[in-house]
Structure formats: C-alpha cells, structure tokens
Regions:
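N-terminal secretory signal peptides that target proteins for export/translocation
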Residues: 1-4
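Sequence-structural signature of mature extracellular/luminal beta-sheet repeat domains
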Residues: 23-340
Length: 340
C-alpha cells in the first residue's frame, strides 16, 4: 500500500512538472461565494501610511495584529523609525504599536493560545539583523529569540529567509524556512516551544516533499501540516512526523493559510494566466478558498481585480467567528470578509 501511495504521489509530482512547463491546468470549478468584502476597516494615524504586508492574525479578544513593512515594502524598515507591529480593535481602532528599528523585512505573525506574538523577519542585513523569529508579549516585551541575527544558514539554530510559522497542538513550532530566492532554504524546521531543534523535512525541487517558494504553513488539531508550496502551485499535506499525505493543486497558488476549527482557509494572491509571467498558473484565479481539512472546497472569494497586479490579500487571519481579515502587498491595505 505504501509503495502505491508513493507511486501516486510521484505521478502527481510529474503532472505538476508538466503544468509548470506550460501545459494548461484544470479549469477552476464555480464555487459559491458566501462572503462580502469590507474595505477601509482600520484607521492609521494622520500622516502614517499602511505598508505592504502578508502578516496578520487575530487574538482571543478579536483584536487584529498586523506586521507591515514600515509604510513601504522592500528596504523600507531599515530606513524607517515607525513601528511595524500594529494592534487594532475589532472595529479598526489603533490600540498600540511597537518594533521600530528591529526588523528587516516583515513576513509573518502568529498569535498563540496565550496571546503572545510570534514574529517572522525574512529579510537580512548581513552580520547585523534579520533571518530570525521572535516571541513577544502584547506589550512588546521580547520573550524568545530564534536564529542568528544577520546570518544565513541551514544548521539546527539557523534560518535563511523564514516565511511562516505554525504552532502544533502540543505547543511545538513548525517553521517554514525559505522563500523564493534561489539560495534560501526549502524546509520545515520542527522545534520545541523553547526553540530547541527537533528535526527538519524537505528540500528544494518540484517533487513530493520538495518545495520551490514555500510561503505558508498551518497545523490542525491532529498535528497535520498544510504547506503552501506557492511557486509549485500546490498545497502539500504532511503528518506530524513529516510523512507526505497529499498534494493538492485545486487550492490554487497558496500565499497564506489558516485553520480555525475544522475549516481550512487559503489565499491565492498571485495566479496569472499569461505565459512567462510571474505567478503563471493558468486555469486558476486569485482569491480566498474556504473548505474542509479533507481538501473539499466550499467557498471561493474571487479577487475583484484579477487582471491587475497583486491586489488581493497575501496573508489572512481568521477570527473564532469565521471573519476573515486580509493584508495585501500591492494595495497596502487591510480588508475584511464577512459572511452574507
């Protein structure tokens, strides 16, 4: 049975490779859309612009935490004195902020069950800062620091452009280490809650248990991992011990993933049909997928500007009530999606 499963997975990998080389994928079915988009949902201080961002999450009180790129995008934070970590009330009022001068390229934020904040800095200033993960209290007190500041590496305590993080049901950390740059890592790093290395899985490539542009990770209540293997236009599902369980291409090109209860949310912020264009994924459309942990999709929220630049959220957070919050890179705004 195991050999049959692996054979099937390798066939899927080969099918993906043919798609990546330019063949047409399956056309996206017409899923229902039960959500409406709400814009202008957060208030920024006078003179302070929202930066690009894919890092957003919700705490136990419904407050929205955004880790944005200091009013700009690439290179903005090292030249800025603004706070990139922003806390908003459910109504969008700015409650607090911190983090000025601490980060290179904000790329992820996760709120744990104790309402502490896990911050992912995917950029690097060689020998100085970046390539790290931090745990903060909501008051901005540093509780834990992972990785070596300003160092690229693939050792047990090192990272190279970490993209995202998820917390397992046992409190251990699953860190998605790597991004789209050719020399960055392509792996999942499993650590204790205190940051001690346990093991890692994955490598660079297009086959099963390989990643090319890993960008998002979530873990369900059973410890299964859901990895947005974005550049490979797929979502890979792994067991808590790193065994490959499934490869899904029908969830688009995942940039952000969240799980709330038994519901899986994934946002595709990049799919494009133009041959040779970044994000080439013909037959799929940008938007937010909502569905079950078995891979069944129940809803799809389409990008209202599918032919433009990256305009839809790249990262999402979901409240306990199922309200979806999104942070976008291109439009540099926070959006809300509520059920009709």
């Amino acid at each position: 049975m195991k050999s049959l499963i692996m054979k099937t997975l390798y066939i899927l990998g080969a099918l993906y490779a043919s798609v990546a080389s330019g063949q047409q994928n399956t056309v996206l079915p017409e899923y229902p859309n039960s959500y409406e988009i709400v814009r202008d949902v957060v208030e920024m201080p006078v003179g302070r612009q929202m930066g690009s961002g894919n890092a957003i999450d919700i705490d136990s009180r419904g407050n929205v935490w955004v880790f944005e790129r200091c009013g700009g995008n690439n290179g903005a934070c090292p030249e800025s004195d603004v706070d990139p970590v922003l806390q908003f009330s459910p109504e969008g009022k700015l409650l607090s902020s911190f983090g000025s001068g601490m980060f290179v390229w904000p790329h992820g934020i996760v709120v744990d069950e104790d309402d502490n904040l896990w911050i992912i800095d995917a950029g690097v200033i060689e020998g100085e800062k970046g390539n790290q993960i931090f745990k903060f209290s909501q008051e901005g007190n540093l509780l834990l620091e992972l990785g070596e500041p300003g160092v690229r590496g693939d050792g047990p305590g090192q990272f190279n452009e970490p993209s995202d993080l998820a917390i397992g049901p046992d409190g251990t950390l699953y860190i998605l280490d790597g991004h789209i740059n050719p020399d960055s890592n392509r792996r999942i790093v499993h650590m204790t809650a205190e940051g001690d290395f346990i093991e890692s899985w994955g490598s660079k490539g297009y086959g099963p248990l390989q990643f090319e542009g890993p960008h998002a990770i979530a873990v369900d209540s059973s410890g299964r991992m859901y990895i947005g293997d974005r550049t490979n236009n797929r979502l890979q599902v792994l067991s808590s011990t790193g065994e490959l369980l499934a490869i899904w291409t029908h969830w688009g090109r995942p940039s952000g993933i969240r799980i709330v209860g038994d519901t899986l949310y994934a946002v595709d912020s990049e799919s494009r049909a133009a041959v040779g264009e970044y994000g080439y994924n013909p037959g799929w459309h940008r938007g937010i997928y909502v569905g079950h942990l078995d891979g069944t999709i129940t809803d799809f929220i389409p990008d209202p500007s599918p032919s433009g630049a990256t305009s839809f959220p790249e990262g999402i957070g979901v409240s306990d009530e199922g309200v979806i919050w999104g942070a976008s890179v291109g439009d540099r705004e926070v959006l809300k999606f509520v059920r009709r």
